[in-house]
Amino acid sequence: RHHRKRIGHTVKQLAKLVKHIHEY
């Protein structure tokens, strides 16, 4: 089983959140 794709998706979402926080 490969859960790398799921982790990648989470990382991408986290990055988006971080960018949003940095914009504040």
From Swiss-Prot:
Top-rank lineage group of the source organism: Eukaryota
Keyword set, alphabetical order: Secreted
Tissue-level expression: Expressed by the skin glands.
Gene Ontology CC terms: extracellular region
Subcellular location, principal: secreted
Compartments where located: Secreted
Annotated protein name in UniProt: Skin secreted peptide 1
